């Protein structure tokens, strides 16, 4: 079956969905039979397209859906897979199928050819599941289960102990951690005893000074280490946020590049057409132009302020 027959069938299916009648299913089955396509397959695409357009209406219409936080609906992915399978079985190229299904031609999907093609390959390679896919946005952190503790590591890969929370009330000061309190008392008592022993011997003042100086130096290094560990964790968090934002901006740039390319092609096709073709194509051209401008963030309400 040639490419034109596939296109006619999909075009008829879209027409019957846009303007449903009592004989819609009959017309589709008849055309599928004449084109050599399984009638059940054609009817399945008709049902999927109907359900997809109904889902779009539930989201407030095509414009609101295109600017919603959903990138792909589950039913939309099922329809995408079915349309590609029909065309590929008849030796159509993926590039041609993407163009035919996109906003540039039959407008079955409110997507550009590259968006359709990329998503089809992701489905084929099972990189994505057939489910509602939200648009990616930066700065969002996944929710973790309650009481789940994440260990922090320093620049050497060692686990950093959790920060000690000082007691805030007298009751907490008395009973917050008896074992910790005992260890600190024993440690300080030992230091005090050693200092006293050194001080009892004449001429040992320098040793006492060196000991206290060493303790001070070690405690200072410990404080600096804690500060460095905290800064390192902060930098890691900031780096991850910047990486997410950069990925989002790249995705946005790719989308806008596709939309701009589509806009240029639409304007060029119209500008270089004959006068008669321009008059006939003006309504469709205007509609396509509005959709593409909306994808670029240009709306009727804001274009004068840009």
Curated annotation (Swiss-Prot):
The keyword DNA-binding applies. The keyword Nuclease does not apply. InterPro entries: MogR_DNA-bd, MogR_DNA-bd_sf. Keywords: Cytoplasm, DNA-binding, Repressor, Transcription, Transcription regulation. Signal peptide: none annotated. GO terms for molecular function: DNA binding. Coiled coil: none annotated. It is found in: Cytoplasm. One of its GO terms (cellular component) is cytoplasm. Its main location: cytoplasm. Transcriptional repressor of flagellar motility genes, such as flaA, during extracellular growth at 37 degrees Celsius. Binds directly to gene promoter region and probably prevents RNA polymerase binding. At low temperatures, MogR repression activity is modulated by the DegU response regulator in an unknown mechanism. This is Motility gene repressor MogR. It comes from Listeria innocua serovar 6a (strain ATCC BAA-680 / CLIP 11262).
């Amino acid at each position: 079956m040639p490419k034109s027959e596939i296109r006619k069938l999909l075009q008829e299916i879209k027409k019957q969905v846009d303007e449903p009648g009592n004989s819609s299913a009959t017309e589709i089955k008849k055309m599928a039979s004449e084109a050599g396509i399984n009638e059940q397959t054609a009817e399945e695409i008709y049902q999927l397209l109907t359900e997809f357009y109904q889902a779009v209406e539930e989201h407030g219409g095509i414009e609101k859906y295109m600017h919603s936080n959903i990138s792909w609906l589950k039913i939309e992915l099922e329809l995408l897979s079915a349309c590609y399978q029909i065309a590929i079985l008849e030796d159509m190229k993926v590039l041609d199928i993407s163009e035919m299904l996109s906003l540039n031609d039959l407008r079955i999907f409110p997507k550009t050819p590259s968006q359709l093609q990329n998503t089809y390959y992701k489905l084929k390679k099972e990189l994505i599941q057939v489910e509602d896919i939200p648009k990616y946005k930066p700065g969002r952190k996944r929710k973790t289960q309650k009481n789940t503790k994440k260990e922090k590591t320093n620049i050497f890969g060692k686990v950093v102990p959790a920060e000690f929370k000082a007691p805030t009330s007298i009751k907490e000061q008395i009973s917050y951690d008896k074992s910790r309190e005992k260890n600190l008392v024993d440690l300080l008592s030992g230091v005090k005893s050693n200092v006293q022993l050194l001080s009892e011997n004449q001429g040992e003042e320098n040793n006492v000074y060196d000991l206290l100086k060493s303790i001070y130096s070690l405690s200072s290094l410990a404080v600096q280490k804690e500060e460095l560990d905290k800064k390192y964790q902060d930098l890691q968090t900031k780096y991850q946020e910047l990486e997410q934002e950069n990925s989002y901006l790249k995705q946005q740039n790719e989308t806008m590049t596709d939309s701009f390319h589509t806009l240029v092609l639409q304007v060029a096709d119209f500008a270089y057409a004959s006068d008669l073709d321009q008059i006939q194509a003006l309504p469709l051209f205007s509609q396509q132009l509005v959709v593409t401008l909306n994808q670029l963030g240009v709306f009727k309400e804001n274009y004068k302020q840009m």
